From Swiss-Prot:
Residues given in the record as L-citrulline binding sites: 87, 123, 127, 175, 260, 272
Matching Pfam families: Arginosuc_syn_C, Arginosuc_synth
Pathway membership, UniProt: Amino-acid biosynthesis; L-arginine biosynthesis; L-arginine from L-ornithine and carbamoyl phosphate: step 2/3
Protein name stated in the entry: Argininosuccinate synthase
Binding site for ATP: 8-16, 117
Reactions listed under catalytic activity: L-citrulline + L-aspartate + ATP = 2-(N(omega)-L-arginino)succinate + AMP + diphosphate + H(+)
Length: 400
C-alpha cells in the first residue's frame, strides 16, 4: 500500500478540494486532521463528516482549545505580540500547533506524507513546512494548491464538478481563517486597497460606529504575566479570551484593517477581528509599564517585536525564539496586579491600575504636599546627563 497522506484540514475550500484531488491524482489514501482552536462556526462533527464526504479514509478531530490558549496565545500576551505594531498573529500562532498535531497523526496513522492547502503567495506555507522540518524532517510534504498553481476559480470549479460540499462561490470569494484568538479575512474586493470593508466581512465584532451600547468597564487580573481573573472571577486563559471576545466584540473593539509585509516579499491587505486579544495585550502591556524597571522594560519592547517577527515568519521552533521566551519568563516574575479598562465604540481605554509589585511611588511622583523627591539633586543630574551633548555642541559651534 502506498503511504497515506496526512492533510491539515480546515473544512474550507482549498483543503476540501485537496482531499479529492490527492485521491484522484496520486491514488493515496488521505487522513484529514481538523484542529478545534475555538474557531466556532460549524460543529466539528460537521467538519469531520465533510472530510469523509470529500473522500478521506479517516478524519481526526482534535480539541486543542486549552492547549492553544495556554501554550500559544499566552506567550503572545506575555510578549505583547503585535506584528508591525498592529497584527496580533491570529493565524501565525495556530500553525505550529497544527504542525505538532499533524506530526502526531502521521506517526499514529502510518503516514509518510503531510499536506497543506496553502498557496505560494502566503506565509502559511513557510510556517507549515519549516515546522515539519523542525519536528519531523523525515516526512515528505505535499502542497497541491501551491505546486499545481490552483487559483480560487479553479478550486471552485473543481468543487462544483466533483460535488464537493463547500459554501464558496465566485461571487463570495473571501478567504477566512479564524480561531479563539481572532479572525482573518482576505481576498475578493478587499484586495483593492481603496475599497472599504462591508458589513458582511465582520463576524466577531459589532459595528463600533453605532454607539448604542453602554460602555463596558472590565478589570483584568494577572499573576506573573498570566491572566487569571476577569472582574474578580477566576478564569483560565481560554476563558479570559472567550469572555473578552464577547464583551469587547459587542463594543466593536478589535477591528483591524492592515496592509502588512508578508515573509514572501509582497504586501497584502487583511481584515482582522481580535477583540479578546487586543484587550489582553493592552492590559498586559499597561501592567508591565507599572511593574517593570525602566531599562528592563525598554529592552523587553525590542524583544517583544523580535518575538512577534519570528512567529510571523514561521520560526516558532527556532533557537532564538526559545531563548527569548526564557528571557520573557524572567521578566514576568513581578507582572502581577489588575488593570481596569473601558470598552466602547471600538476603543480600549485604560483608566485604572493596581499592583502589589508596582514600582510607582506616590510620594516620589506627587507634586502635592508629602512629596519626598529631593529636587536639589536634579540640577547636578541634568548637568551630567547632558554633558556629552554640551561638549559636542560647543565644538560644533566653535565655542571655547
Amino acid at each position: 500500500m502506498s503511504e497515506r497522506v496526512i492533510l491539515a484540514y480546515s473544512g474550507g475550500l482549498d483543503t476540501s478540494v485537496a482531499i479529492s484531488w490527492i485521491g484522484k491524482e496520486t491514488g493515496r489514501e488521505v487522513v484529514a486532521v481538523a484542529i478545534d482552536l475555538g474557531q466556532g462556526g460549524e460543529d466539528m462533527d460537521v467538519v469531520r463528516q465533510r472530510a469523509l464526504d470529500c473522500g478521506a479514509v479517516e478524519a481526526v478531530v482534535v480539541d486543542a482549545r486549552d492547549e492553544f490558549a495556554e501554550n500559544y496565545c499566552l506567550p503572545a500576551i506575555q510578549s505583547n505580540a503585535l506584528y508591525m505594531d498592529r497584527y496580533p498573529l491570529v493565524s501565525a500562532l495556530s500553525r505550529p500547533l497544527i504542525v505538532k498535531h499533524l506530526v502526531d497523526a502521521a506517526r499514529e496513522h502510518k503516514g509518510g506524507i503531510v499536506a497543506h492547502g496553502c498557496t505560494g503567495k502566503g506565509n502559511d506555507q513557510v510556517r507549515f513546512e519549516v515546522g515539519f522540518a523542525s519536528l519531523a524532517p523525515d516526512l515528505e510534504v505535499l502542497a497541491p494548491v501551491r505546486d499545481y498553481a490552483w487559483t480560487r476559480e479553479k478550486a471552485i470549479a473543481f468543487a462544483e464538478e466533483n460535488a464537493i460540499p463547500i459554501n464558496v462561490t465566485k461571487r463570495s470569494p473571501f478567504s477566512i481563517d479564524q480561531n479563539v484568538w481572532g479572525r482573518a479575512v482576505e481576498t475578493g474586493f478587499l484586495e483593492h486597497l481603496w475599497n472599504a470593508p462591508t458589513k458582511d466581512v465582520y463576524d466577531y465584532t459589532e459595528d463600533p460606529t453605532l454607539n448604542w451600547s453602554t460602555p463596558d468597564e472590565v478589570i483584568v487580573g494577572f499573576d506573573k504575566g498570566v491572566p487569571v481573573s476577569v472582574d474578580g472571577r477566576d478564569v483560565t486563559v481560554l476563558q479570559a479570551i472567550e469572555e473578552l471576545n464577547r464583551r469587547a466584540g459587542a463594543q466593536g473593539v478589535g477591528r483591524l484593517d492592515v496592509v502588512e509585509d508578508r515573509l514572501v516579499g509582497i504586501k497584502s491587505r487583511e481584515i482582522y477581528e481580535a477583540p479578546g486579544a487586543m484587550v489582553l495585550i493592552t492590559a498586559h502591556t499597561e501592567l508591565e509599564h507599572v511593574t517593570l524597571e525602566r531599562e528592563l522594560g525598554r529592552f523587553k519592547r525590542t524583544t517583544d517585536q523580535k518575538w512577534g517577527e519570528l512567529v510571523y515568519d514561521g520560526l516558532w521552533f527556532s533557537p532564538l525564539k526559545t531563548a527569548l521566551e526564557s528571557f520573557v519568563a524572567k521578566t514576568q516574575e513581578h507582572v502581577s496586579g489588575e488593570i481596569r479598562l473601558v470598552l466602547h465604540g471600538g476603543h480600549i481605554a485604560v483608566n485604572g491600575r493596581r499592583s502589589q509589585e508596582s514600582l510607582y511611588d506616590f510620594n516620589l511622583a506627587t507634586y502635592d504636599e508629602g512629596d519626598t523627591f529631593d529636587q536639589s539633586s536634579a540640577k547636578g543630574f541634568v548637568h551630567v546627563h547632558g554633558l556629552s551633548s554640551s561638549i559636542s555642541a560647543r565644538r560644533d559651534l566653535g565655542i571655547k
